[in-house]
Structure formats: structure tokens, C-alpha cells
């Protein structure tokens, strides 16, 4: 189908001409409970709509007498999030047969397709960018984004003949399931790589990573067990003065700039200080930084190495601690050591909570036990860890690129479906199923006649 031209037998029509919108159940907060009880029905809310399906792990239940018959979800219904504080949530949909009787709340609505419209076709349309983009432009509100019932008069949908609707829905079911399966496999890889990196760090500090390397060394290499304090020339807290965001003074790292194995020199504020304070707290290449305090346990005591200074004068705050080492220890190796699982566990065991903040003292950091091989082996460990991490980073980048392509593939397939490209051959083989009485135009006339006979669309809405 060329741009702007519909396939033979198709028509464009507002969603409201082929579906009826049913509004959700209104109830008071005290009328809802979080467990099943006699004469109560489970209620779908916007948070239960996830990836086109229903997540029923967090349902509420309301008295059955609040629920009209038309507000009970049928297998053909497409449940829509009608209101939300998040624009991305408004309009999201779910279409799934539930094995129990269920209704939906006032912040949701149901698109109930007419009998001559295949529900799976409408459900797939609500996943498409055609629908999502229009919903985004129509939803509005001061604090809450809403779709009004009249919005569905303004959202156009390409309508094929009924037989073709079913074929399109079946093809999309198959193709999108394959896409989802591929996506799920890709999404597992970052966790696999995370475990791989942790295994590398563990092997680096227990000697396994360089076990074979040691066999070729003239002198047997031994890992010494010693307190961190014994290889320190300095352990100093940062500046306690309040920084500014206006760019006045010298750059100073934020607490969040230090993560395990990384220092982000772009994560900064600014601080005016005296010359003596600058000289005492100015960072240099090879400095190790530890987080002294953080609201999250996983970030307390993490160690990052300043590998290449990007600022002429860079300071650090009092919630970070700077460590400088003797010549017996490479800072790159010590960063690896304190990022390893065993060292992180030991560090977290020393964490104390004060006024909601989790922290560790300089004394506790000094007392940490370090496994230290000779400098030559430290250098070999650093080389191997960097090599393996670079390998993992390359894979992760490739996976992220592939995931982006897979995510785009879903919308590409949906776009082709609603342009008629997935069923071009089927139409050529079945001309009788797309023309005359079987055309979409004839189908819409039948729907129009049935609505007129039953009192029209507005009457249907009032009955809900």
C-alpha cells in the first residue's frame, strides 16, 4: 500500500464507529478491600495493565452491587487506562481472557468491539504508534492526564474486511510473540554480564585469574593478607562547606559521582574555598575515592579510581574519603579489590545507620583486610580484568543496539499490518472476501444499521 492509499476493500473510520466505550466502576475508598470476599468482584486498575496483558498480583475488590452487567470484562474487551498522572500510562491497553469474573475501575474504560469487528485487530491497533501518538496529543489535564470518551471520535483506525482483520490479528500474534521472545532473551544478557563481571572480580582477588600465569614466574607469587591501613599514605575526608550550582569557585564532586569501579567527573557542583583548603583537598590522578555516607546501602563504601583528571582543580565533599597508597599497591588493583563481592560484603558489614543515612567510618575502611600480591602480579591482574571487562562492554553495547532494533521492530510490524502490507498476498488470493458485501464499507453500513435499530451508540453508552 502506498502512502495515504488504502488497500482494496479497506476504509478509514473513527474508533468510536466500531467500538462502544464503557466507563469503569465508581466506588469510595472505604468500599474497596484487598482480598476476595463473598459478593465482591476483583477490579482492574491502570497499574494492572502491563505490556498488553493483565497483572493480577495487586487487585482490589469492590461490592458486586456497584458493578453493572456491562462493566464486567468480556473476552472481547480491550481495557484502556483513561486517566493517570503519567502521560505514558494514559491509553495503554490490555486484551486478555481472564479465568474469573472481573470488572474495572473509574480510571479505566473498555473498548467493546461491535460483533462484526474482530477484537484482536482492535487490541493490536491500541499498541501501534498510530494510536499512541494520537492518544498523547489528546490527553490533557492540570495534574492528571485524561482521555475523554469523545476522544475516540477523533482517533481514526484503518478497517479491513472482517476476514482480513482475523488474518492480520493472527499474523501479528505470531510475529509479535517472536519479537517478545527475542527481546526477553536479549534482556537477560545484562544480568549474565553483571554476574560475569562479578566472577572476574572474585577471581582477580583470590588468585584464580592469574593462577596459570604464576606457574611461569621465576619466583612464587604470594597473596599477602594485611590491613588496608598498612598500604596507605593518606586517608582524608572531603570538604564540608556547602557547594553551589551557579558555577562559582572550583568544581567539586557530588556523592553520586563515585560508584564501584568508576568516578564520574561530570557529576559536579562548585565550591569557593581558601588556598590552603584547595591544596589539602585537590584531587590528582591515582586517587582512590570511597563513599562515606549514602541513603542506599549498596553505595556505601564503594571505591572508584580517578584515572585521568579532567579539571585543573577538582575537589571532593565530606561524604567522600580520599585514599593515597604506598608504592607496594597499584591503585588500579585496589579499586578492583574493593569492587569484588567478598570485599563489598566485608565493607557493608561495617556500615552503621545514623538519622536515616547509612555510613562507614575512616577507621573501618582502614581496618579492611586486603589480599595483596606482588606489584608485578597486581599489574597482570589489572590487565586481565580490563581486557575481560572490555569484552563484556562490547557485548553489552551490541546487545543494547540489538534491543533498540527489536523495540523498533514491533512498531515497524504494526505499521505494516495497518497499511495492509502483511496481507497483500492474502488479498490477491481471496478477492471475494474483500469486495462487495464483504468489504469494510459494507461492514460499516451493517454496524450503522444495527446501531440505529438498537437505539444508537449514545443509548448504548447510557446503558453502561
UniProtKB/Swiss-Prot annotation:
Keywords: DNA-binding, Restriction system
Induction details: Encoded in the hsd locus, in the order hsdR-hsdM-hsdS. There is a promoter upstream of hsdR and another between hsdR and hsdM. This probably allows expression of the methylase enzyme before the restriction-specific subunit.
Gene3D superfamilies: DNA methylase specificity domains
Record's GO cellular component terms: type I site-specific deoxyribonuclease complex
Domain of life, per lineage: Bacteria
Family recorded in the similarity comment: Belongs to the type-I restriction system S methylase family.
Additional free-text comment from the UniProt record: Type I restriction and modification enzymes are complex, multifunctional systems which require ATP, S-adenosyl methionine and Mg(2+) as cofactors and, in addition to their endonucleolytic and methylase activities, are potent DNA-dependent ATPases.
Protein name: Type I restriction enzyme EcoKI specificity subunit
Source taxonomy: Bacteria, Pseudomonadati, Pseudomonadota, Gammaproteobacteria, Enterobacterales
Amino acid at each position: 500500500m502506498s502512502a495515504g492509499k488504502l488497500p482494496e476493500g479497506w476504509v478509514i473510520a473513527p474508533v468510536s464507529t466500531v467500538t462502544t466505550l464503557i466507563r469503569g466502576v465508581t466506588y469510595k475508598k472505604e468500599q474497596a478491600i484487598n482480598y476476595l470476599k463473598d459478593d465482591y468482584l476483583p477490579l482492574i486498575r491502570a497499574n494492572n495493565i502491563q505490556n498488553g496483558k493483565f497483572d493480577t498480583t495487586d487487585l482490589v475488590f469492590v461490592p458486586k452491587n456497584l458493578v453493572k452487567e456491562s462493566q464486567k470484562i468480556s473476552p472481547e474487551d480491550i481495557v484502556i487506562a483513561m486517566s493517570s498522572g503519567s502521560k505514558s500510562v494514559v491509553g495503554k491497553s490490555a486484551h486478555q481472557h481472564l479465568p474469573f469474573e472481573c470488572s474495572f475501575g473509574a480510571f479505566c474504560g473498555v473498548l467493546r468491539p461491535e460483533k462484526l469487528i474482530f477484537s484482536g485487530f482492535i487490541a493490536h491497533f491500541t499498541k501501534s504508534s498510530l494510536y499512541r501518538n494520537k492518544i498523547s496529543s489528546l490527553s490533557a489535564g492540570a495534574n492528571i492526564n485524561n482521555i475523554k470518551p469523545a476522544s475516540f471520535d477523533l482517533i481514526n483506525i484503518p478497517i479491513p474486511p472482517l476476514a482480513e482483520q482475523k488474518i492480520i490479528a493472527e499474523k501479528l500474534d505470531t510475529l509479535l510473540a517472536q519479537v517478545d521472545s527475542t527481546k526477553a532473551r536479549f534482556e537477560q544478557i545484562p544480568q549474565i554480564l553483571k554476574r560475569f563481571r562479578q566472577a572476574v572480580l572474585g577471581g582477580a582477588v583470590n588468585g584464580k585469574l592469574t593462577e596459570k600465569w604464576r606457574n611461569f614466574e621465576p619466583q612464587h607469587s604470594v597473596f599477602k593478607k594485611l590491613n588496608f591501613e598498612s598500604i596507605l599514605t593518606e586517608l582524608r575526608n572531603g570538604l564540608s562547606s556547602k557547594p553551589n550550582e551557579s558555577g562559582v569557585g572550583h568544581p567539586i564532586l557530588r556523592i553520586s559521582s563515585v560508584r564501584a569501579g568508576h568516578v564520574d567527573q561530570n557529576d559536579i557542583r562548585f565550591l569557593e574555598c581558601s588556598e590552603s583548603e584547595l591544596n589539602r583537598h585537590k584531587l590528582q590522578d591515582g586517587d582512590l575515592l570511597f563513599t562515606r555516607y549514602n541513603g542506599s546501602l549498596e553505595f556505601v563504601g564503594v571505591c572508584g579510581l580517578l584515572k585521568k583528571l579532567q579539571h585543573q582543580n577538582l575537589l571532593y565533599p565530606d561524604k567522600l574519603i580520599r585514599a593515597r597508597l604506598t608504592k607496594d599497591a597499584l591503585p588500579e588493583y585496589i579499586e578492583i579489590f574493593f569492587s569484588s563481592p567478598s570485599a563489598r560484603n566485608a565493607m557493608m558489614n561495617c556500615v552503621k545507620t545514623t538519622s536515616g543515612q547509612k555510613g562507614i567510618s575512616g577507621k573501618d575502611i582502614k581496618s579492611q583486610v586486603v589480599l595483596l600480591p606482588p606489584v608485578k602480579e597486581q599489574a597482570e591482574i589489572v590487565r586481565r580484568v580490563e581486557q575481560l571487562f572490555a569484552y563484556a562492554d562490547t557485548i553489552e553495547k551490541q546487545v543494547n543496539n540489538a534491543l533498540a532494533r527489536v523495540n523498533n521492530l514491533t512498531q515497524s510490524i504494526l505499521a505494516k499490518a495497518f497499511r495492509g502490507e502483511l496481507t497483500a498476498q492474502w488479498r490477491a488470493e481471496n478477492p471475494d472476501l474483500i469486495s462487495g458485501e464483504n468489504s469494510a464499507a459494507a461492514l460499516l453500513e451493517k454496524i450503522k444499521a444495527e446501531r440505529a435499530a438498537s437505539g444508537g451508540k449514545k443509548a448504548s453508552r447510557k446503558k453502561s
